[in-house]
Amino acid sequence: MKNLFEAATVSEIQERMAHLRPDSERQWGKMNVAQMLAHNSAWMEMAAGLNSPPRALIGRIFGRVAKKKVLGSEQPIGRNMPSEKSLIVSDEREFVAERERLLQWTNAFAAAGPSGCTTHPHCFFGPMTPLEWARMAYKHLDHHLRQFGV
């Protein structure tokens, strides 16, 4: 399974990001493209331990099973999945700045490797190994890039 510790996977994600435009239209969801980029940077900050949303009750109940389903399959994350409230971006953002910020985060995450991952549990899935964080980072980015057709 692809993960963001692999240089080829990081390159693939960044090439896809290069195809985004300020007017790229979403195929589902509520965020515009700049908000999506900011949301993904906030997710990467969570993976690095810079923010640690508390575990949601529903995640405590279903998180372990859901993690196995998501990470145990090459299947992409489905459309319209709920987001952690603290990672939702609803204010206006500047596209070029947000794309650059996310490019920097993908590079930093890959360069830091396993030691750069948080030890805090994911807010829904619970405890995750660095490799699980790297796989989920890929799947999360892939999900949102597909949301905007790239």
Positions of the model-derived regions?
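Short alpha-helical hairpin
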Residues: V10-E15, R79, G113-H120
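Short, helix-capping/interhelical loops that line the mouth of catalytic, cofactor-
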Residues: G49-R101
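Structural signal for well-ordered, non-membrane alpha-helices
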Residues: Q14, A18, M44-E45, L103-A110, ...
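A charged, amphipathic interaction segment
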Residues: I88-M136, H140-L141
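Globin-like tetrapyrrole-binding proteins
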Residues: M1-A7, M17-A18, W28, P82-F95, ...
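Short, contiguous alpha-helical
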Residues: S24-L71, T119-V150
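Short, amphipathic alpha-helical "lid/cap" segments that border enzyme active or binding sites
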Residues: V10, Q14, L37, R99, ...
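Alpha-helical bundle segments that constitute or directly flank the non-heme di-iron/ferroxidase center
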Residues: M1-P22, H39-S41, A48
